[in-house]
């Protein structure tokens, strides 16, 4: 199965999980997995949250920023992969002054 994100409407969620600005995403969900093409504008963030019943894998495709996972700050940029296991907490921040932070994410229900 192929997912064509260009055919999925982008939605913008302000202050996602308590973050700054808004989170823009194109999402595919089938009840078992959520697969997302996401984008954070400069200065935007996804707030700190815990994956109670899922994990998350994020594949960064453009821009730069950082994640804080279980209190550890880690840089991310195109080519980086971030994994947040079930039961752990993380946040994502685009600290670039002028470039969107783009990524694909997979959240399997566990």
Language-model segments: what does each one mean?
Residues 1-33, 47:
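A short, N-terminal "cap"/entry segment at the start of jelly-roll beta-barrel domains
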Residues 72-86:
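Short acidic-glycine-tyrosine-enriched beta hairpin
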Residues 86-110:
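Ligand-binding loop in jelly-roll beta-barrel domains
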């Amino acid at each position: 199965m192929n997912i064509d994100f260009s055919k999925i409407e982008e939605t913008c969620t302000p202050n996602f999980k308590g973050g700054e600005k808004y989170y823009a995403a194109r999402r595919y969900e089938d009840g078992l997995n959520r697969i997302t093409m996401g984008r954070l504008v400069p200065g935007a963030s996804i707030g700190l949250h815990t994956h109670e019943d899922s994990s998350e894998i994020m594949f960064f495709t453009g821009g730069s920023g950082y994640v804080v996972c279980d209190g550890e700050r880690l840089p991310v940029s195109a080519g980086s992969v971030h994994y947040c296991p079930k039961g752990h907490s993380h946040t994502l921040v685009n600290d670039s002054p002028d470039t969107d932070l783009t990524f694909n994410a997979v959240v399997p229900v566990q």
